[in-house]
């Protein structure tokens, strides 16, 4: 069967993945890449990828079925851009960053307008719908999340968090927020201004990323200590919670180098997920079988953001400096690029179910 970037006949059972078919985006950002978002509209025949960067810009690329790509439109903020998300219909993107504001870019007209503001940089922004009404939720270092109806200049609601917001994800009615001091807040968007549940991360070190399951029954947490946790929302499912080590080098002389988990993305169809880290590798996992499906060779730099497209045939990953080694690591020749990995064969398919003991 022909598919993205050619054939999809790869059915190797090896756990070592292949990068030889990966395609680089042309005209990449000029500074570290912070976030990726694909157009989610199933009726749009084309894939569009939005990319936010420390160079103060949001760029939107059109990606053809053979992997060829071109920049379509871009928008500039007044400071580094930390987050970007597509609207459900694929006609607009919303982005936010260090300039303490969120902006909406209309892809057809190229026009941008401010839609949100905080008292400190906005670290996260997500689009969602409330009763069919397009809305956004922003999370800031001012220790609040705010909800925005685009028809109003004032927030539709504000929630005070325990600490600065570092990461956030939305899936259906599930909103998960990760803050400083390892707090994890869970909100049911049917009751958006109160916490459904608050917990301390089961991981002992700083939270880098949270990502909601495809079925919105739970979420994954990644930390700076090369560890990932799988966490279910409801108390009745707590026995299925677990954590595992990842993005760690093979021990040398009893020393293990531990790398941050920078990004976690769930496959939209299979419910399997990826982790990517400061070590420059990404892996695909099956949480239900507690099994690593594929691991990939080092890509030559830290991976700062990842995303699957709407049908899971493309896995995009951003290579750029993540400051995990301080200013000394920020060399002039450090790569800054976005790669498109064609998801072939069984790379992301879950293992056949087996009876649990």
From Swiss-Prot:
State the UniProt keywords alphabetically: Membrane, mRNA transport, Nuclear pore complex, Nucleus, Protein transport, Repeat, Translocation, Transport, WD repeat
Q: Which InterPro entries match?
A: WD40/YVTN_repeat-like_dom_sf, WD40_repeat_dom_sf, WD40_rpt
Q: Return the PROSITE patterns for the record.
A: WD_REPEATS_2 (PS50082), WD_REPEATS_REGION (PS50294)
Q: Where are the WD repeats?
A: 28-71, 76-115, 117-158, 160-197, 256-295
Question: What are the transmembrane regions?
Answer: none
Which Gene3D superfamilies does the record cross-reference, listed alphabetically?
YVTN repeat-like/Quinoprotein amine dehydrogenase
Q: Where is the segment annotated Disordered?
A: 1-31
Q: Where in the cell is it found?
A: Nucleus, Nuclear pore complex; Nucleus membrane
Name of one Pfam family that matches: WD40
GO cellular component terms, alphabetically, are:
nuclear membrane; nuclear pore
How does the protein's chain sit in the membrane according to the entry? Peripheral membrane protein
Top-rank taxon of the source lineage equals: Eukaryota
Task: List the GO biological process terms.
Answer: mRNA transport; protein transport
Its family remark reads: Belongs to the WD repeat rae1 family.
Q: How does it assemble?
A: Component of the nuclear pore complex (NPC). NPC constitutes the exclusive means of nucleocytoplasmic transport. NPCs allow the passive diffusion of ions and small molecules and the active, nuclear transport receptor-mediated bidirectional transport of macromolecules such as proteins, RNAs, ribonucleoparticles (RNPs), and ribosomal subunits across the nuclear envelope. Due to its 8-fold rotational symmetry, all subunits are present with 8 copies or multiples thereof.
What's its job? Functions as a component of the nuclear pore complex (NPC). NPC components, collectively referred to as nucleoporins (NUPs), can play the role of both NPC structural components and of docking or interaction partners for transiently associated nuclear transport factors. It is specifically important for nuclear mRNA export.
- What protein name applies here? mRNA export factor GLE2
Question: What is the species listed in this Swiss-Prot or TrEMBL entry?
Answer: Chaetomium thermophilum (strain DSM 1495 / CBS 144.50 / IMI 039719)
